[in-house]
Design a protein with these regions (language model features):
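A conserved acidic beta->alpha catalytic loop
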Residues: 26, 41-51, 71, 95
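Non-catalytic, C-terminal membrane-associated alpha-helical segments of glycosyltransferases
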Residues: 200-201, 210-270
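Short, acidic, metal-binding catalytic loop of nucleotide-sugar glycosyltransferases
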Residues: 25-34
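Conserved donor NDP-sugar-binding/catalytic core segment of glycosyltransferases
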Residues: 103-135
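Acidic helix N-cap motif at the loop->helix transition within catalytic regions
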Residues: 19-21, 46-55, 99, 103
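Conserved nucleotide-sugar donor-binding catalytic segment
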Residues: 9, 84, 140-220
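Glycine-rich, basic loop-to-helix element that forms the pyrophosphate-binding segment
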Residues: 69-86
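Short aromatic/hydrophobic "clamp" motif used to bind/position activated sugar donors
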Residues: 91
């Protein structure tokens, strides 16, 4: 295995028998390996735990750590459980149905290790049909993101997150929709640095919304986003006028997403 860097990878697992191995393989193929890989089973109730044990046995003893939750708490709380146990200076999150470019950790860690004012980074993603040979990437240029941008738009997918282990904030416990965006808004509201690289270092295998998984429920996603703005408003981070304007813009985005899903469904029928 390649040289390791002080990064803990956390993968929340829920009934992911068909995709988990692909995600783990993408971590194993990193040019700079993470210090550890933490698999958190969110009370799947199927053979996911058996697969986790099999994967653990394939690699160096202690490199893959298993966390077995006895109640289903959702991805946000599962990520927190792994985060709290992480030993690395940084924590990277990967969803069980996604994967990474082989140089993701190398390039992201290099930036975070030097940018002491940044507590969270993310990067671009690309949709694939299957895990394949990745395009050669030699560098990733990270740029700071202003708070105004974070409020208007979720800047990157959760599978691109790398955070400082000692960050005080966590994903909102029990939240099952748009918890990643709320987390970023909280951090940005506190004046802490967030940066993004446009380079595609995460691979997804289905559309961001309108397909299998939690994101398929557009209305619940919409309610989650509206709740985010109201919570941030109540905390005094933004004004009432800003909340109203952001909610209006959110509904416009919802209409666009709904139209995209409708067109996609019509295309499949044809």
């Amino acid at each position: 295995m390649n040289a390791k860097v002080p990064v803990s990878v956390v993968i929340p697992c829920f009934r992911c028998m068909l995709t988990l191995e692909r995600a783990v393989v993408s971590v194993v193929r990193q040019t700079e390996l993470p210090q550890e890989l933490i698999l958190v089973d969110d009370c799947s109730g199927d053979d996911t735990r058996s697969l986790m044990v099999q994967l653990q046995s394939r690699y160096s003893q202690g490199w893959i750590r298993l966390v077995l939750l006895e109640t289903n708490v959702g991805a946000a709380s599962a990520r927190n459980a792994g985060w709290d146990l992480a030993r690395g200076r940084f924590v990277a999150f990967l969803d069980a149905d996604d994967a990474w470019h082989p140089r993701k950790i190398e390039l992201q860690y290099k930036f975070m290790d030097s940018a002491t004012d940044v507590v969270i980074t993310g990067h671009g993603h690309v949709q694939l049909n299957a895990l394949q040979d990745a395009d050669d990437v030699t560098e990733a240029e990270f740029q700071r993101i202003p708070a105004s941008y974070v409020f208007i738009k979720n800047p990157f997918v959760t599978s691109s997150f790398m955070v400082r282990k000692d960050l005080d904030f966590r994903f909102l416990a029990g939240r099952r929709y748009m918890e990643d965006h709320y987390f970023l808004m909280q951090v940005s509201s506190a004046g802490l640095g967030i940066a993004k690289a446009r380079t595609h270092l995460a691979f997804i295998f289905k559309p961001i919304f309108g397909e299998a998984g939690l994101s398929a429920d557009l209305l619940k996603m919409q309610r989650g986003e509206l709740d985010n703005y109201r919570l941030i408003g109540r905390a005094g981070s933004i004004s009432l006028l800003a909340v109203i304007l952001l909610e209006a813009y959110s509904w416009l985005k919802f209409c666009r997403r709904y139209a995209i899903v409708w067109v996609r469904s019509i295309s499949k029928v044809k």
